[in-house]
Structure formats: C-alpha cells, structure tokens
C-alpha cells in the first residue's frame, strides 16, 4: 500500500491521476494506493445526482462516475481516494463503504468527536450534523473516488446545495464541533493510521486461502 499526499490540487488533475493509477493497479503494474488531497472550491455531482440540488452555480460543477449526489470540496476538507483491488478482497462494495466509515469514525474519535452511521445513509454523522461524505466507484474492481472529511473548512459552500441530495442536511466539521483549531496534518496522520490498521483485518482472498 502506497500513501501519496498531493497537498492542494485541482479536482480535474487529481481525477486524471486516479484514472491512471486505477489502470495500472488493474494491470498489476502499480501497488494499491491511498491518495490524500485538498481541492480548491468545487462541487461534484455523482451518478444519482440531480442539478436541482445545486442552488447556486457560481462555483465549478464536475459530473463524475461515483455513487451519490452532489457534494462540496474546499481547502480544509481532507479528501481521500483509496485505490484498492476489490477483485482480491471479495468484490464487496458495501463492505468497502462500511470500511471507509469505520476509518473516519475512528479518526474523528481521536479528536474527541463521536461519529456514527445512519441507517440507510452512507457517510459519517454526528449530533451536530454530517461530518463526512463517502461516494465510490470501481473499474475492473479497482476502487476510485472515496471520502471527504470536514476538518477545518469554511462550511458556507454547503449552503448553496442540498448536500448529498438531502434537503435540510446540516454539515459540520471537526473544528466546528470541538470549538478549537484542528490540525489537518494530525487528522491526516490519524486517518492513515486507522486506514492501514483496519485494512490489515481485511485480508485479500489469496491470503485467506492460505490460513
């Protein structure tokens, strides 16, 4: 597993990198990879998205092939693109989504924030609102897209949409909940730690067969 921190990168550039790595991983010429990035302000619209959930078109909108509806990205939000070969991990996309939720719930707990799942919804929620959005896709059973964890971003961009297509959805962040500055670098480190730790419990099929 390779971890790549891309810093702040335009969405289109990060998407092109995902596509190239997905092809390489599917061909067996690159290792599974976790990309970490922050994006300049942009809205992304998933496969089940509806433009009526966009209330203001003053910011760039990109239509993409992940699941889910519309969401917002901006600096101060940690975006993760895990590129995993589910062909070696049971081809279970639902399990993969629950895995991502567990990673983010654990990372939030390290900052003193209690996150949880909501039945019938994908993502991480808190009593104060939705903390993280998750939307995934796969090509040749290699995952792309991933999660967006609100760390310390300006949340006003969410007021111009119905986040994830949910009317009245309140978005929050680790910084808003804790009421104090939250270090992006520290959150990043905790996400990586929990991602790698939990991934070790999700053995590829080839390894399971040898147990």
UniProtKB/Swiss-Prot annotation:
GO terms for molecular function: lipoyl(octanoyl) transferase activity. It comes from the Bacteria. Substrate binds at residues 66-73, 133-135, 146-148. The active site is at residue 164. One of its GO terms (cellular component) is cytoplasm. Signal peptide: none annotated. It is found in: Cytoplasm. Its EC number is 2.3.1.181. Residues 28-203 form the BPL/LPL catalytic domain. GO terms for biological process: protein modification process. The keyword Transferase applies. PROSITE patterns: BPL_LPL_CATALYTIC, LIPB. Pathway: Protein modification; protein lipoylation via endogenous pathway; protein N(6)-(lipoyl)lysine from octanoyl-[acyl-carrier-protein]: step 1/2. InterPro entries: aa-tRNA-synth_II/BPL/LPL, BPL_LPL_catalytic, Octanoyltransferase, Octanoyltransferase_CS. The record marks 130 as: Lowers pKa of active site Cys. It catalyses: octanoyl-[ACP] + L-lysyl-[protein] = N(6)-octanoyl-L-lysyl-[protein] + holo-[ACP] + H(+). Keywords: Acyltransferase, Cytoplasm, Transferase. Belongs to the LipB family. In the reaction, the free carboxyl group of octanoic acid is attached via an amide linkage to the epsilon-amino group of a specific lysine residue of lipoyl domains of lipoate-dependent enzymes. Catalyzes the transfer of endogenously produced octanoic acid from octanoyl-acyl-carrier-protein onto the lipoyl domains of lipoate-dependent enzymes. Lipoyl-ACP can also act as a substrate although octanoyl-ACP is likely to be the physiological substrate. This is Octanoyltransferase.
């Amino acid at each position: 597993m390779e971890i790549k921190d891309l810093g702040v990168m335009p969405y289109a550039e990060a998407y092109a990198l995902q596509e190239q790595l997905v092809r390489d991983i599917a061909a067996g010429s690159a290792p599974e990879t976790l990309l970490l990035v922050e994006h300049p302000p942009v809205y992304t619209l998933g496969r089940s998205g509806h433009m009526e959930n966009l209330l203001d078109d003053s910011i760039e909108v990109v239509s993409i092939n992940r699941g889910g509806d519309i969401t917002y990205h901006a600096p101060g939000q940690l975006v993760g693109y895990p590129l995993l070969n589910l062909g070696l991990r049971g081809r279970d996309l639902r399990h993969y989504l629950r895995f991502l939720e567990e990673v983010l719930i654990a990372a939030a707990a390290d900052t003193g924030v209690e996150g949880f799942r909501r039945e019938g919804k994908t993502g991480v929620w808190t009593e104060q609102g939705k903390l993280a959005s998750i939307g995934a896709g796969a090509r040749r059973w290699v995952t792309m897209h991933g999660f967006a964890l609100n760390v310390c971003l300006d949340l006003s961009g969410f007021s111009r949409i119905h986040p994830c297509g949910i009317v009245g959805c309140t978005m929050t962040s680790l910084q808003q909940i804790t009421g104090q500055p939250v270090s992006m670098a520290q959150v990043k480190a905790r996400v990586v730690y929990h991602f790698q730790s939990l991934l070790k419990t999700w053995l590829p099929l080839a390894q399971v067969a040898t147990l």
